[in-house]
């Protein structure tokens, strides 16, 4: 249960950060829309950005988790237990978190009116 709450917190935090990115890049988004980029292309670029951030975070989390497990096992003189599928779980959860957190900001970015956004 705690892990679900932490995942929800991670999605909300990442979505807030992505939303702020969309707000800061509103002129760029408006310019892309004005020169003919489709709403789907704008949406896709932000979802891809979220996916890349999520996979990077999942990879770093896996590396830090494995190093921590190895250090604690070495200090306690326990045999380390590191199932290889945990890397895949970390990558999948990171990717899912990145995509989920990018959906709403991507939708907001794709709905911006270019004329209003360029004016400021």
Residue ranges and their predicted role:
Residues 1-8, 82, 86:
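Loop-to-helix entry region at the N-terminal start of transmembrane alpha-helices
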Residues 13-16:
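Amphipathic alpha-helical repeat scaffolds
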Residues 6-9, 19, 27-73, 77, ...:
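Transmembrane alpha-helical interface segments in multi-pass membrane proteins
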